Design a protein with these regions (language model features):
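Conserved G/P- and acidic residue-centered "switch" motifs that form tight phosphate/ATP-binding loops
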Residues: 122, 140
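C-terminal intrinsically disordered extensions
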Residues: 129-130, 144
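Extracellular disulfide-bonded cysteine-rich modules/repeats
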Residues: 135-137
């Protein structure tokens, strides 16, 4: 279902839901059975797998890959520019990958150029500055290893 108040510019499967006030740019790739909640922006160079939930208020910038069965909590902040400036002719797009089954808690900030491993969990409000290995729980500002899950 595509809510009539969303700006859907990409082709997505019928099994995926996009709620009101979302903007999805034309080259974004979104898989089956996803749920994109209200007030989300998904740019062009974005790949989203199957069975992904993206809660309200998330912007998924160019260079972000989200694999299958990932949960992205409300108001998660992705980044794709290590040294942001209003105008930077030397800008380099940094890629971020969220691997299968990972869960990103509400209000997290993920700095660019990192990988969140398979089935990893990031606690709400954490700031992730480096790669998180598969099957680990990380929490805090900056996020640190808590335990294996």
């Amino acid at each position: 279902m595509i809510h009539p108040l969303s700006d859907m510019q990409a082709l997505i499967p019928e099994s995926t839901n996009v709620w009101q006030f979302c903007v999805i740019l034309p080259k974004a790739q979104i898989g089956e059975n996803c749920n994109i909640c209200s007030h989300c922006l998904i740019e062009n160079d974005v790949k989203i797998g199957d069975n992904v939930t993206i809660k309200s208020g998330v912007q998924v910038w160019d260079g972000i890959t989200i694999e299958d069965n990932v949960q992205v909590g409300a108001n998660v902040s992705f980044t794709n520019d290590r040294y942001p400036r209003a105008k930077n002719p030397n800008w380099i797009l940094e890629h971020t990958k969220i691997c299968k089954g990972a869960s990103i808690g509400a209000g997290c900030t993920l700095l660019c150029g990192i990988t969140i491993g398979e089935n990893a969990m990031i606690g709400a409000g954490s700031v992730v500055t480096k790669d998180v290995p598969a099957g680990e729980l990380w929490v805090g500002t900056p996020a640190k290893f808590v335990r294996k899950i």
